[in-house]
Structures are given as structure tokens and as C-alpha cells.
């Protein structure tokens, strides 16, 4: 009997060609991001010369280390495809329609940013933006974004801005949560795939949820965010899949609208550096509450000072150049201790490019007995 080739397995030639295409795709995005930042920085410094004194230059050695770290991240991204963590198509996922539509708006938005910088306005919102009901720490022009996180325009520009900031590898950084989450969910191997429930806290425009869907095609996915505008954008993105039914909630992560012990897995990407310390603890405790015993909680956020002291200048540059009022406290905070205080067991931390990852377990009775 003649065997049928498995279409999911690439031939060595196809695999090499696909990897080459992925490397070219990432290199193109990296070069474009560098060019964009170079031009926009020059323009900003010309308009506001004092900005140049706020940062310290990075050494050639540090720049080389960053470049090597980015390349390592791309290699890990490719290896996870080879391991079957997510399909190869995920590597080429882009937001080209949004890029073509909204990239010019990024340049048109620059004069507004310059005007706020000159007036030192960091909590500026349009008159028609509803601000009632939001915590004070949230009402900020994070990254100098016009209207903070509270307008549709901000939501439309966000993914472009973040991807350029991270040299075109923002989604690759997000995807590093997928392997530990998938490994953690093996605890529930007896649960049918369609009954697995995963929550993305501070889901924003839905990029992480889209990656989760590629990794867990049958799971029930949930997202929660404090911005109605970003939830609308997430709904738009996720609804591009005609079989998707986005389960999105508008809520503060300090008070999640979900029952106790509900989710098999919980993720949180790029949130904690934009929270004051008390809010970080409250969010972690809420994540503990809604996670099932035996469930996994994975955090992705900025690298911290204790892990990468050689990057101190770069970390200081980030908080100086972008409006990140809680960043200096965050890079010195111990999220491991916060996780354990909430009741989680910290399994491991990882560093990939500019991000740090915490993988935590909510102990069940079996785990507690084994540890005692």
C-alpha cells in the first residue's frame, strides 16, 4: 500500500526556503523600523532640541548584543514552529492592511505629540473622550499616544507603533508565552480540547489572542481590557476568522468579571510596567483567583534591571523618552515575590530580546501534598 505524504511536514528544501523567507521578512521589518525611528527621532530633536539631553548613547557592544538577542529570538520562534507549538503561517502574520491605511497617520500624529511635549502635557485627552470610571493611573498618554488608550485612533495606531518600537519583532515576543502555556495545559490532558478555557488579561487589540487561537484552535478564548476602543479593535481583528466568536469583556484587571477557578490558563502581555505597584499585586491576585488549581499563568513584560544590569542605560532611556510613569519602579520590582504572595508557585523566568517572562502554577491539592 502506498503511503500518503503528510502535508503538514515540510520537505528539507521547502523548510529551508520557508526559513529563509521568514528571516527575510524579519530583516525587512527590522530595517524599516530602524529607518522610521531614525527619521522620527531626527525630526523630534529638531523641533525639541532639549530631548537629546534626556538619553545616553548606547555603546557599539551593547547594540551588537541587542542585535544578537533579536536573532536568537527569531531562531526560537522558528524552532517552536518545528516543535509544532504553532503553525508556520503564524510567522508571516502581519497587519499589512492596517499598515497601508494607518501608517501615514503615524506621521500626521507627530506634531500633536510635539505640541504636548513642549507643553509637558502627559494626561491630555480630547473633550469627547469619556474619562469617568477609570483609575487615575490609567489616564496617561502612555508612549505619548494621543488620547492614551481611550480612542479608536489610538487603537488603530497601537500595533504599528509597538512593532516599530521593538524593531519588527513584537509578535515574536508575544509568542514566547505560547510554549510554557501549552506545556502547562498538559496537566489537563483528560479535558477535551473544546472545554479548555484561556484568558488573556489586558488583551488590547487582540494580537496575543490571535496567536493563542493559532496555538489552541479548539479552546474557548477570553479577553479582558480596560479600553473600549481597544476591545473594538480586538473584535475587528479576531472576527476576520469567520469561525471565531470573540468573548471580550470591558473591565479592570484588578476586578475580573469571571468566576473563581474558571480558567485552565491565563496570560498577560505588556501590562505590568504600566501599573503602579499596588495595582500589579491586585491584578496578580485576581489572576490567581480565576485560574483553576493546576492551571498556568504566564506573564510577558519588559526586562528588568536585576536581570540585565548592562542594559541600565537603555532602560533609563526608555522611561525618559516615553511617558512611562511607573517604569522605573517596575524594573526594580520583584514580580516573583508578588506571584508567590498571591499563592502561585513560580516555575521559571525567561529572557528573550527585550522581554522577561514569568511562568507560574496555581497549586492544586496534589501539588501542595508533594511540596509538604
Regions found by a protein language model. Name each.
Residues 281, 298-342, 346-352:
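C-terminal alpha-helical "lid/dimerization" subdomain adjacent to the S-adenosyl-L-methionine
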Residues 241-256:
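Conserved SAM-binding strand-loop segment of SAM-dependent methyltransferases
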Residues 254-266:
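A short acidic, Gly/Pro-enriched loop at the edge of an enzyme's catalytic core
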Residues 227-229:
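Conserved SAM/SAH-binding beta-strand->alpha-helix loop
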Residues 1-132:
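N-terminal accessory segments
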Residues 205-216:
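Conserved SAM-binding loop of SAM-dependent methyltransferases across substrates and taxa
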Residues 281-293:
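A short glycine-rich, Lys/Arg-flanked "PGG" loop and its adjoining helix->strand segment in the class I
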Residues 342-372:
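Core SAM-dependent methyltransferase catalytic element
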Amino acid at each position: 500500500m502506498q503511503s500518503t505524504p503528510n502535508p503538514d511536514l515540510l520537505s528539507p528544501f521547502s523548510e529551508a526556503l520557508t526559513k529563509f523567507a521568514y528571516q527575510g521578512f524579519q530583516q525587512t521589518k527590522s530595517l524599516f523600523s530602524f529607518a522610521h525611528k531614525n527619521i522620527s527621532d531626527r525630526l523630534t530633536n529638531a523641533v525639541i532640541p532639549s530631548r537629546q539631553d534626556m538619553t545616553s548613547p548606547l555603546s557599539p557592544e551593547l547594540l551588537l548584543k541587542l542585535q544578537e538577542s533579536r536573532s536568537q529570538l527569531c531562531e526560537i520562534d522558528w524552532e517552536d514552529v518545528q516543535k509544532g507549538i504553532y503553525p508556520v503561517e503564524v510567522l508571516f502574520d502581519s497587519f499589512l492592511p492596517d499598515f497601508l491605511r494607518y501608517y501615514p497617520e503615524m506621521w500626521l500624529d507627530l506634531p500633536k505629540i510635539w505640541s504636548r511635549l513642549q507643553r509637558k502635557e502627559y494626561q491630555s485627552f480630547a473633550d469627547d473622550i469619556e474619562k469617568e470610571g477609570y483609575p487615575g493611573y490609567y489616564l496617561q498618554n502612555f508612549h505619548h499616544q494621543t488620547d492614551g488608550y481611550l480612542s479608536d485612533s489610538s487603537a488603530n495606531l497601537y500595533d504599528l507603533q509597538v512593532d516599530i518600537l521593538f524593531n519588527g519583532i513584537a509578535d515574536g515576543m508575544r509568542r514566547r508565552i505560547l510554549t510554557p502555556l501549552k506545556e502547562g495545559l498538559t496537566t489537563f490532558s483528560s479535558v477535551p480540547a473544546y472545554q479548555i478555557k484561556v484568558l488573556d488579561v489586558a488583551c488590547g487589540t487582540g494580537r496575543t489572542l490571535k496567536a493563542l487561537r493559532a496555538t489552541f484552535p479548539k479552546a474557548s478564548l477570553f479577553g479582558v481590557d480596560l479600553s473600549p476602543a481597544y476591545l473594538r479593535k480586538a473584535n475587528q481583528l479576531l472576527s476576520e476568522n469567520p469561525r471565531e466568536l470573540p468573548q471580550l469583556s470591558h473591565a479592570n484587571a484588578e476586578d475580573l468579571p469571571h468566576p473563581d477557578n474558571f480558567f485552565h490558563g491565563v496570560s498577560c502581555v505588556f501590562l505590568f510596567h504600566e501599573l503602579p505597584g499596588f495595582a500589579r499585586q491586585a491584578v496578580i491576585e485576581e489572576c490567581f483567583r480565576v485560574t483553576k488549581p493546576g492551571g498556568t499563568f504566564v506573564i510577558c513584560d519588559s526586562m528588568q534591571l536585576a536581570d540585565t544590569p548592562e542594559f541600565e542605560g537603555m532602560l533609563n532611556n526608555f522611561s525618559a523618552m516615553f511617558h512611562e510613569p511607573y517604569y522605573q519602579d517596575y524594573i526594580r520590582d520583584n514580580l516573583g515575590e508578588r506571584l508567590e504572595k498571591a499563592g502561585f508557585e513560580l516555575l521559571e523566568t525567561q529572557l528573550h530580546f527585550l522581554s522577561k517572562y514569568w511562568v507560574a502554577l496555581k497549586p492544586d491539592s496534589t501539588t501542595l501534598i508533594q511540596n509538604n
